[in-house]
């Protein structure tokens, strides 16, 4: 899959984004309810001199789950170890990390829904009893050895909470969903990032970037950098409405943040399948893309803005999408054909 500017997933170019990330809860913009709840539990844990309870963060990619995990560790004044579900292939991989944690440290596992089952089962006793059960030997003579672990905090992150098993999900004391950001919140993030990048930006320029950022801070910061490049080369270096609009139009990111692939999906559904209902497999085949990629990368935002609907018979393009694309809406097709 090619790297998309408007993808919420981390791209190669985002590796240098750490300088823009907030380090304290007071600097973290948005997610007010989540932030307030976590702040209370952090203070309570510090007062009791205990490890924070385990935390599960879920929601679309790019909303700040990794950033929030790092902030939690900073607020607790402890170290954080960052890994991911796919990186923990064997129980030994997890054991090596757990045995090197300090008291009250944070272990952050991104994409926790992709943990191999055998590794997940080792995690149960670690989360609940702060212990590792290790099997010594094989066959009838095998015996179990319990190894004590420091009391740590596990923070799991996932974009697909529904794929977590019940035993794992039930072991998290705190479960928080991160929501898409408002345009106003994204403007605050863009203005903060512009200041850190030493780039001058007008309110109109900030608004233009924010409204095309799909409610996602990671995308907002990515687009800000691209618009900054355009402003420095084609203008005075100040990001205003004119050069923000010109830069984003050049990148083919429209007023709502849709890119060419988003529009291709919608037009394919309209032109080849009369707006639906159409199965996800048919859409994937028509645009030569994987089903999982469409479900994980493209579809969530189109659902969020109401451009497509999921129905028992398949996906349907709504009138909103027709209007946005400038295509005449056929009342005998699409969503109305369901009835």
Swiss-Prot record:
- A GO CC term? cytoplasm
Q: Matching SUPFAM superfamilies, A to Z?
A: P-loop containing nucleoside triphosphate hydrolases, Winged helix' DNA-binding domain
Record-level Gene Ontology MF annotations: ATP binding; ATP hydrolysis activity; four-way junction DNA binding; four-way junction helicase activity
Recorded hits in Pfam families, A to Z, give: AAA_lid_4 (PF17864), RuvB_C (PF05491), RuvB_N (PF05496)
Broad EC category: hydrolase
Residues that bind Mg(2+)? 66
Keywords in alphabetical order, please: ATP-binding, Cytoplasm, DNA damage, DNA recombination, DNA repair, DNA-binding, Hydrolase, Nucleotide-binding
Region span, Head domain (RuvB-H): 255-339
Q: Return the annotated region ranges for Large ATPase domain (RuvB-L).
A: 1-181
- EC no. given is 3.6.4.-
User: Where do the segments described as Small ATPAse domain (RuvB-S) lie?
Assistant: 182-252
- Reactions catalysed according to its record: ATP + H2O = ADP + phosphate + H(+)
Q: Which SMART domains match?
A: AAA
Annotated compartments:
Cytoplasm
Protein's UniProt keywords contain DNA-binding:
yes
Does the record's keyword annotation contain DNA repair? Answer: yes
**Which positions are annotated as binding ATP?**
20-21, 62, 65-67, 128-130, 171, 181, 218
Annotated positions binding DNA: 310, 315
Q: How does it assemble?
A: Homohexamer. Forms an RuvA(8)-RuvB(12)-Holliday junction (HJ) complex. HJ DNA is sandwiched between 2 RuvA tetramers; dsDNA enters through RuvA and exits via RuvB. An RuvB hexamer assembles on each DNA strand where it exits the tetramer. Each RuvB hexamer is contacted by two RuvA subunits (via domain III) on 2 adjacent RuvB subunits; this complex drives branch migration. In the full resolvosome a probable DNA-RuvA(4)-RuvB(12)-RuvC(2) complex forms which resolves the HJ.
Family under the similarity heading: Belongs to the RuvB family.
Its domain description in UniProt is: Has 3 domains, the large (RuvB-L) and small ATPase (RuvB-S) domains and the C-terminal head (RuvB-H) domain. The head domain binds DNA, while the ATPase domains jointly bind ATP, ADP or are empty depending on the state of the subunit in the translocation cycle. During a single DNA translocation step the structure of each domain remains the same, but their relative positions change.
Report the protein's function: The RuvA-RuvB-RuvC complex processes Holliday junction (HJ) DNA during genetic recombination and DNA repair, while the RuvA-RuvB complex plays an important role in the rescue of blocked DNA replication forks via replication fork reversal (RFR). RuvA specifically binds to HJ cruciform DNA, conferring on it an open structure. The RuvB hexamer acts as an ATP-dependent pump, pulling dsDNA into and through the RuvAB complex. RuvB forms 2 homohexamers on either side of HJ DNA bound by 1 or 2 RuvA tetramers; 4 subunits per hexamer contact DNA at a time.
Q: What is this protein called?
A: Holliday junction branch migration complex subunit RuvB
GN (gene name):
ruvB
């Amino acid at each position: 899959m090619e790297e998309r500017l408007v993808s919420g997933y981390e791209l190669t170019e985002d590796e240098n984004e750490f300088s823009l990330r907030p380090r304290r809860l007071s600097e973290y913009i948005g997610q007010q309810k989540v932030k307030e709840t976590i702040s209370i539990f952090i203070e309570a844990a510090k007062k009791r001199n205990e490890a924070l309870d385990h935390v599960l963060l879920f929601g679309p990619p790019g909303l700040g789950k990794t950033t929030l995990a790092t902030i939690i560790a900073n607020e607790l004044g402890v170290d954080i170890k960052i890994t991911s579900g796919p990186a923990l292939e064997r129980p030994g991989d997890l054991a090596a990390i757990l045995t090197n944690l300090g008291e009250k440290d944070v272990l952050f596992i991104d994409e926790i829904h992709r943990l191999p089952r055998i590794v997940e089962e080792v995690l149960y006793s670690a989360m609940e009893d702060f212990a590792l059960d290790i099997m010594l030997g094989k066959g009838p003579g095998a015996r179990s050895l319990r190894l004590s672990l420091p009391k740590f905090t596990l923070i799991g992150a996932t974009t697909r909470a529904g794929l977590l098993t019940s035993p794992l999900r039930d072991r998290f004391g705190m479960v928080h969903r991160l929501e898409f950001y408002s345009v106003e919140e994204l403007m605050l993030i863009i203005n903060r990032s512009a200041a850190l990048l030493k780039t001058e930006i007008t309110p109109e320029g900030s608004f233009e970037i924010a409204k095309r950022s799909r409610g996602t801070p990671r995308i907002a910061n990515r687009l800000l950098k691209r618009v900054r490049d355009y402003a420095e080369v084609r203008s005075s270096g100040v990001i205003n409405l004119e050069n923000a609009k010109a830069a984003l139009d050049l990148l083919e990111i429209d007023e709502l943040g849709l890119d060419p692939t988003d529009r291709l999906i919608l037009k394919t559904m309209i032109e080849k399948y009369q707006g639906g209902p159409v199965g996800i497999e048919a859409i994937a085949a028509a645009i030569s893309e994987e089903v999982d990629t469409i479900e994980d990368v493209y579809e969530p935002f189109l659902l969020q803005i109401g451009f497509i609907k999921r129905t028992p018979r398949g996906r349907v393009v709504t009138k909103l999408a027709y209007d946005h694309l400038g295509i005449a809406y056929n009342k005998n097709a699409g969503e109305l054909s369901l009835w």
